[in-house]
Amino acid sequence: EKSTKIFRVFEDIDIIQLRIGVVLRKKIINLLSLNLLLSIPVPGRKNNYFPWIHVDDIVGFVNHSISSNLNGAFNLVGSELTSHESFFKSIQKYKKSIIPWVLFIPPNLVKLFFGKMSEMFLYGPKTKPIKTLNSKYKFKYPTLQEALLNLSE
């Protein structure tokens, strides 16, 4: 809530700040599954959280926030917590990958290659959409499995 106060110029205007996880679309899933098929290592730690959201839920929440006159900060991430490892293994499952493993780049190499940007890969936030759910928004794809099933068709 503090972060939206700096944008408040007029008292009668509602401000919505969206904190959006990795947006899942068909093109992204196809690209990630190609990386896994070629056994290209994934940057980050396998135990880190991987906040994600289906693109249709972003559109759905924006429409919901307008029609419900919401204001404040909202986390737009899937309602189930997902680790890096379970995220990529789920992609393998839904894309029917023949490679049974996911390789992760060691943290020191990630820091070397990406510098300060490495924090994005190494420290996945444990983000839950509590306020989003409390706003009565109903996710179209609340679980990773439902999102991937839709994007794998």
Label for each model-derived stretch:
Residues T4-K26:
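Conserved beta-loop-beta element that borders a ligand/cofactor-binding pocket
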Residues D12-D14, I98, K136:
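A generic structural signal for alpha->beta connector loops
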Residues D14-I16, G72, K138:
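Conserved beta-strand segments of alpha/beta enzyme cores
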Residues I29-W52, K93-K126:
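Alpha-helical membrane-targeting segments
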Residues L32-P41, N47-T82:
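Alpha-helical substrate-binding/gating segment
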Residues F61, S65-K116, L149:
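Mid/C-terminal beta-alpha module of Rossmann-like enzyme folds, strongest
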Residues S83-K89, F113-K138:
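Conserved C-terminal active-site "lid" loop/helix of NAD(P)H-dependent oxidoreductases
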Residues P142-E153:
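Amphipathic terminal alpha-helices
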